[in-house]
């Protein structure tokens, strides 16, 4: 009997051992053992997102495939028998985007609407941005999401790009520095980010089929550089490829972009995923190194299986991609069995959002120190639709399901001001009537497009005499928003509409006749034309799209509670005709909504793919993007890159500029607050290269620093390092980064157009900082 029990026990132990041997567990067994144990279908299940069960992309609601977290953008499949959990990814760049309400519960799941990326870069303060990222990542973790599909570090090539509000700057260094701080802040919570859109996603028109045509130097120096810096400084968990083609090949199918540049040159260790429904060939994406196809389609499953079985796609390549996904999964909270409590500190995060938005606002004009408002200002006449309906952010995946948005009306009231009740009543009655007259959507997909905004109400509807008599001053808000799928129009988005200009001129004329001041607030998604109207108001404050606390932030600055310290992250041209890429960017005036939706579904406008700036876009502006063009070509601008006013004045001491044996430059500058109000200053360092061996801009931003809040009379010495390698330009002929010999002008300036920078000349020796394989050429075989 004892012998029989021993035999039975041995058999049972043996069977258990066989089961365990057949079913290794992720995190317990070596990853290779887990991969070896997977069937072909399981491997495909892992590399294709969770909606791969659907037969068409229309069956999977765009940007809402979350089963584990309702409203999340997508899900990576799990394999239970191998200890692989499903993981969740969700939008977006201004805060987590999930469903705020769920069935069978009264609990809400709102997220903080933080300021958009453009506001973050306008702070020029990486420590502040890190704190925003920390708060944002905290919500990601508390709500059970593993990866936030953000940030986006594409370059603002043209002011009409519909998603510029999601991007950081026209300058690679500023964009990368702020973006890296955001990544590090978010990931400090042990959740992931997805750096996007890799690469050259600089227009929304026909973004899924647009072919970007350009040269490797332009790509590497301007458009890839911010990605490179962020990868090296922050190592985000994931990278998201872009929709567009690059020199004839889909970005998500370019091995030279994803494997050679991203992984081999820059040392990226994480996972690469597609943008939603991006690319044409699943097998080609797998081969290029695009590990995960999102959100997943049934035909991708079929194509990969067929490609493996017929030998077109090797099992070695598939296993490589599976490994990258498994390595990602092992980092996630869900793999580590973190239990989300759905209870983030929303009140604390709102305060973080408020502080960040305030610091990112830019004072463009302040005649005779109209701002901050003097104490005798009590009663305010508030004009403009968006004064009462402030715009927190853009549309599409960059939107956030917030609990509230503080309007300028409420912000002023919170600050103790009285707002004219008759004007308020007129706007509240006007808005629903005007909205009823807006065109009705004809296509259900139009819900994903930027919405229509109602025209400004005529001042004839108001008793302007009473408004002037009963109020101490006037404030006008101009609102402009944008989003995915559509680029902005020149006529009514870059330029102000006739109704908006009439409102500004009418209010200014009426109040100025009575000796009263007028302030304009620009609650806008990006650059707008100002020359034609800016002579009217006494002050102009650029609030951007500041998130849910916007009205409070504006009021803080108007009242002098906070001193504006934001600086422009892009140039504001006098006219759109001055933009260097104007001839090589879509004209949204001619694009129809049905065409836009067709393009998203993979149906290009051009029947032969030959419509300029729609089917293909040539980057003929080269490296002369933004201020690099305006300053080099001496083109006048309305407001230069790096510009911003303050309520105080700062004086700079003589810079101390040194160079070590390796050619690295160090700049020390002492900044003194010479005014009467506490404030922060942004010190900007530009460098002019000799430009003998290669055509170069006259100045390029090579470093910056922001002071702490300096009290009147207080000084601070800031240090700015410029590594030798950061002086290099890309030589296409030899495929190398090289520094030319000669004299370099190191200029400490207040903005890119500063005519009297504090200049020091440093002599550098020639050198090659890196030699790389030729990539991103126009013909890819």
Task: Outline where the language-model segments fall.
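Bacterial Sec-dependent N-terminal signal peptides
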Residues: 1-25
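Acidic/proline-rich low-complexity IDRs
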Residues: 4-5, 11, 372, 757, ...
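Generic detector of low-complexity/intrinsically disordered segments
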Residues: 7-8, 14, 703, 712, ...
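Glycoside hydrolase catalytic-domain context in secreted enzymes
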Residues: 21-729, 738-748, 752, 775-781
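Short beta-alpha junctions and helix-cap segments that line functional grooves
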Residues: 732-734
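Short beta-strand elements
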Residues: 754-771
């Amino acid at each position: 009997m004892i012998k029989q029990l021993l035999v039975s026990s041995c058999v049972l132990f043996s069977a258990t051992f066989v089961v365990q041997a057949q079913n290794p567990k992720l995190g317990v067994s070596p990853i290779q053992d887990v991969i070896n144990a997977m069937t072909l279908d399981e491997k495909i299940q892992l590399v294709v997102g969770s909606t791969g069960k659907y037969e068409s992309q229309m069956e999977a609601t765009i940007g809402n495939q979350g089963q584990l977290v309702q409203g999340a953008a997508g899900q990576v499949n799990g394999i239970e028998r191998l200890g692989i959990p499903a993981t969740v990814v969700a939008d977006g760049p201004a805060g987590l985007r999930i469903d705020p309400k769920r069935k069978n519960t009264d609990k809400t799941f709102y997220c903080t609407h933080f300021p958009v990326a453009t506001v973050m870069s306008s702070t020029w303060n990486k420590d502040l941005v890190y704190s925003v990222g920390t708060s944002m990542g905290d919500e990601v973790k508390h709500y059970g999401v593993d990866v936030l599909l953000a940030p986006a570090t594409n370059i603002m090539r043209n002011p009409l790009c519909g998603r510029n509000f999601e991007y950081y700057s026209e300058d690679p260094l500023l964009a990368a520095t702020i973006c890296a701080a955001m990544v590090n802040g978010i990931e400090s919570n042990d959740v992931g980010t997805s750096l996007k859109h890799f690469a050259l996603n600089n227009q929304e028109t026909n973004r899924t089929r647009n072919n970007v045509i350009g040269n490797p130097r332009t790509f590497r120096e301007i458009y890839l550089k911010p990605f490179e810096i962020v990868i090296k400084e922050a190592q985000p968990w994931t990278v998201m490829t872009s929709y567009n083609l690059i020199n004839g090949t889909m970005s998500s199918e370019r091995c030279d972009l994803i494997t050679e540049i991203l992984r081999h040159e820059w040392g990226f260790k994480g996972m690469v995923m597609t943008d939603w429904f991006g690319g044409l060939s699943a097998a080609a994406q797998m081969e290029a190194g695009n590990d995960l196809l999102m959100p997943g389609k049934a035909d991708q499953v079929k194509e990969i299986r067929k490609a493996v079985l017929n030998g077109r796609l090797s099992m070695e390549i598939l296993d490589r991609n599976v490994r990258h996904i498994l390595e990602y999964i092992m980092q996630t909270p869900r793999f580590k069995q973190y239990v989300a409590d759905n209870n983030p500190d929303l009140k604390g995060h709102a305060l973080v959002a408020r502080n960040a938005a305030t610091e990112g606002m830019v004072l463009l004009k302040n005649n005779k120190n109209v701002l901050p408002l003097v104490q005798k200002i009590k009663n305010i006449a508030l004009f403009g639709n968006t004064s009462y309906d402030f715009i927190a952010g853009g549309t599409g995946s960059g939107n956030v399901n917030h609990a509230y948005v503080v309007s300028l009306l409420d912000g002023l009231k919170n600050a103790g001001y009285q707002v004219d009740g008759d004007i308020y009543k007129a706007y509240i009655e006007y808005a629903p009537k005007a909205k009823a007259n807006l065109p009705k959507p004809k296509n259900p997909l139009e819900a994903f497009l930027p919405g229509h905004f109602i025209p400004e109400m005529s001042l004839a509807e108001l008793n302007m005499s009473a408004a002037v008599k009963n109020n101490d001053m006037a404030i006008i808000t101009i609102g402009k928003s944008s989003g995915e799928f559509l680029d902005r129009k020149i006529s009514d988005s870059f330029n102000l509409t006739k109704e908006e200009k009439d409102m500004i001129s009418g209010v200014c004329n009426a109040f100025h006749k009575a000796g009263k001041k007028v302030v304009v607030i620009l609650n806008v998604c990006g650059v707008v034309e100002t020359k034609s109207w800016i002579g009217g108001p006494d002050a102009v404050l650029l609030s951007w799209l500041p998130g849910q606390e916007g009205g409070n932030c504006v009021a803080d600055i108007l009242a002098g509670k906070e001193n504006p310290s934001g600086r422009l992250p892009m140039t504001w041209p006098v006219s759109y005709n001055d933009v260097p890429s104007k001839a090589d960017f879509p004209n949204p005036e001619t694009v129809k909504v049905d065409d836009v939706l067709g393009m998203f579904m993979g149906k290009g406008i051009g029947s032969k793919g030959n419509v300029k700036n729609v089917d293909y876009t040539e980057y003929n502006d080269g490296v002369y993007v933004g201020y690099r063009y305006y300053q080099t070509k001496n083109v006048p601008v309305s407001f230069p890159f790096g510009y911003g006013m303050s309520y105080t004045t700062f004086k700079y001491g003589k810079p101390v500029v040194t160079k070590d044996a390796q050619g690295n430059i160090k700049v020390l500058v002492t900044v003194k607050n010479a005014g009467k109000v506490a404030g922060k200053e942004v010190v900007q360092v530009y460098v002019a290269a000799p430009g003998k061996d290669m055509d170069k801009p006259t100045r390029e931003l090579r470093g910056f620093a922001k002071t702490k809040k300096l009290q009147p009379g207080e000084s601070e010495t800031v240090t700015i390092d410029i590594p030798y390698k950061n002086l290099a330009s890309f030589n296409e002929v030899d495929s190398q980064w090289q520094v030319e010999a000669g004299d370099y002008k190191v200029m400490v300036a207040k903005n890119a157009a500063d005519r009297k920078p504090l200049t020091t000349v440093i002599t550098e020796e020639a050198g090659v900082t890196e030699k790389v394989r030729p990539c991103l050429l126009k013909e890819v075989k």
